[in-house]
């Protein structure tokens, strides 16, 4: 892959990210954090896009830490705390860390795009009908928010039941219209049912990260949950790695289910090993374990870290109504949105 590969498409997608998603304005300080695993073609394109609209792009690049969701070194933490806009491309993101919370508290508009390369930028932003994607997200937000009983199952053995009891749903994939608010790559809505009502089994079958040793799953990882906490982890080698990683923190909050997330970015049709992309596989559901951010509007707690796992082809029932079946949306309005987005098979 040459430096010129998709160069025009990359620059167009970078401008779309800066101008239409992060809503960068002239004079704003745009801090871009990257590590040595970051695709610098993406970083350069985003810096050029920000500068072309007369913002002040500032790049901070550092060696990979090998640890996600943990506090970076002081110069990085200090810089992001005064950003108007913070775009994180570092493979090992620092979301949920103290500096993240400080930056959000100071009004930064933040997005986490860890692991994004030129193909991911073009496929998930540049070639997507972003206005339609945002509208679909708003519809799903309302649909889930109006439901109480949530049942998630699949052919691998996932069978999870919970109740929303009026909990709010966060559309994390919308433009950055609010100060002090994190937005994520388009194609995701997130929430947490009342934690104590979450009971059953989750079987991750596509991706799980961190720990770094996993990423793409070669075998299912089975979790048994009671009252919103992971009690047992079963499977093969990757399940054992995951079990040891969770235990290594010595933190009981690392076993708490933090969120449900529906994935629906039409540029992602299968797992790649980049979790920001994988948790948006079209039709998937992703579950977070560990820290739960305040913006999720759940119970809110801190933990030593956070991890995300993907169930690729769920069947989801909202108060008995089938939202999707085996990863394919069945609800009438959802099907119409899938057609507008140009998703194959609808």
Short names for language-model regions:
Residues 165, 235-236, 290, 328:
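Surface loops and adjacent helix of pleckstrin homology
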Residues 274-345:
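Internal helix-turn-beta structural module
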Residues 162, 203-204, 223-225, 230-233, ...:
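Short hydrophobic-aromatic micro-motifs
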Residues 16, 21-23, 256-259, 309-310:
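Residue-level preference for alpha-helix termini and adjacent loops
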Residues 216, 232-289, 295-296:
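Dual-mode signal for accessory low-complexity, basic/Gly-rich regions
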Residues 218-220, 311-312:
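Short loop/turn microsegments at loop-to-beta-strand junctions
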Residues 1-218, 226, 251, 317-346:
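Active-site bordering "gate/hinge" segments
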Residues 147, 199, 220, 257, ...:
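Short, surface-exposed beta-edge/turn micro-motifs
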């Amino acid at each position: 892959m040459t430096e010129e590969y998709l160069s025009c498409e990359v620059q167009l997608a970078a401008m779309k990210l800066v101008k239409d998603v992060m809503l960068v304005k002239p004079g704003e300080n745009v801090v871009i954090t990257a590590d040595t695993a970051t695709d610098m073609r993406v970083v350069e394109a985003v810096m050029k896009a920000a500068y072309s609209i007369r913002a002040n792009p500032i790049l901070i690049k550092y060696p990979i830490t090998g640890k996600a969701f943990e506090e970076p070194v002081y110069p990085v933490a200090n810089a992001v705390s005064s950003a108007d806009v913070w775009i994180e491309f570092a493979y090992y993101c620092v979301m949920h860390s103290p500096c993240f919370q400080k930056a959000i508290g100071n009004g930064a508009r933040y997005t986490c795009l860890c692991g994004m390369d030129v193909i991911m930028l073009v496929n998930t932003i540049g070639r997507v009908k972003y206005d339609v994607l945002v509208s679909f997200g708003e519809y799903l937000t309302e649909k889930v928010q109006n439901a109480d009983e949530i049942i998630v199952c699949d052919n691998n053995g996932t069978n999870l039941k919970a109740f929303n009891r009026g909990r709010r749903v966060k559309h994390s994939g919308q433009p950055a219209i609010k100060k002090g608010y994190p937005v994520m790559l388009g194609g995701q809505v997130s929430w947490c049912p009342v934690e104590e009502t979450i009971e059953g089994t989750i079987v991750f079958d596509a991706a799980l990260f961190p720990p770094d040793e996993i990423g793409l799953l070669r075998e299912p990882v089975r979790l048994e949950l009671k009252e919103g906490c992971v009690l047992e982890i079963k499977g093969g080698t990757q399940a054992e790695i995951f079990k040891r990683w969770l235990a290594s923190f010595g933190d009981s909050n690392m076993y708490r289910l933090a969120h449900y997330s529906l994935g629906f970015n039409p540029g992602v049709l299968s797992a790649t090993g980049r979790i920001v992309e994988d948790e948006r596989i079209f039709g998937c559901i992703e579950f977070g374990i560990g820290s739960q951010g305040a913006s999720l509007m759940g119970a809110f707690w801190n933990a030593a870290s956070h991890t995300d796992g993907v169930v690729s082809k769920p069947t989801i029932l909202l108060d008995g109504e089938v939202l999707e079946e085996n990863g394919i949306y069945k609800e009438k309005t959802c099907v119409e949105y899938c057609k507008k987005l140009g998703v194959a098979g609808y």
